[in-house]
A protein has these predicted regions:
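Structured surface interface patches that mediate subunit assembly and partner/cofactor docking
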Residues: 2-11, 26-35, 58-75, 95-99, ...
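Amphipathic, well-ordered alpha-helical segments in soluble domains
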Residues: 16-23, 52, 103-106, 110, ...
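Helix-turn-helix
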Residues: 33, 39-42
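Charged, glycine/proline-rich intrinsically disordered loops and linkers
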Residues: 71-89
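A short, structured beta-strand-centered segment in the mid-to-C-terminal lobe
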Residues: 83-103
């Protein structure tokens, strides 16, 4: 991954899992029912990240079998998310959180051996290592959601590396001129409030504590 060492990406991944679990520890019994991400409650959010971690295992299984095609299109993400939440509707927030941590850490343990394997995800075909940055970003963004539900902010320890690594994945997933231009702009973005840029790109509004 140009410019972002593997160890940095994995550290950000581990940090995202840890910080999400730590944020959940701050929730009261009633807090699990409060809105945390759009129409999703904190419980819904825990179920969502559990489902996403499961997808990552499934996609890596496909990659190991030699299938690097996208599992479904990006336009299907909303429907896939809704279906996954329905499937986990009987699982409480704390239980979903505990299962997420175990599943996410197990995925991380698989990554090192498969870092350069071609890997399909909804936005295209990259490598498992490039996609690891997207996974790290997913955990940090949803940590931000939980922390804001608690009235606090969240920022990853190395926002510039997270921005660069996720940008490298997005650029690799694009084809032709668009991908090349995106790759050229990454170094500039790392110096211009990278975490705020990630938040805004995901539809979130940075606060004073971010």
């Amino acid at each position: 991954m140009p410019g972002v060492p593997r160890d940095s990406v994995l550290r950000l991944y581990d940090e995202g899992v840890h910080d999400f679990a730590a944020a959940a520890d701050g929730l009261s019994a009633e807090g699990w029912d409060q809105l945390a991400c759009g129409e999703w409650t904190a419980t819904d959010l825990a179920r969502h990240v559990l489902a996403v971690a499961g997808w990552y295992h499934d996609w890596l299984d496909r990659a190991e079998r030699g299938d690097a095609s996208p599992p479904f299109g990006a336009q299907e993400l909303a429907a896939q998310n809704a279906e996954a939440l329905r499937a986990l509707s009987g699982l409480g927030g704390p239980e979903a959180m505990a299962q997420f941590v175990a599943r996410a850490r197990a995925y991380r343990d698989r990554l090192s051996a498969q870092w350069d394997v071609p890997y399909g995800y909804p936005r295209g075909t990259v490598t498992a290592g490039l996609h690891a940055a997207v996974a790290a970003c997913e955990w940090h963004l949803h940590t931000w959601d939980l922390m804001h539900a608690l009235g606090r902010g969240h920022r990853p320890s190395d926002a510039a590396s997270l921005y660069a690594a996720t940008g490298a994945c997005s650029a690799a997933a694009e084809s032709g001129l668009k991908g090349r231009v995106a790759a050229m702009l990454i170094p500039l973005g790392t110096h211009l409030r990278p975490w705020e840029a990630i938040l805004r790109r995901s539809g979130r509004a940075p606060g004073p504590d971010d």
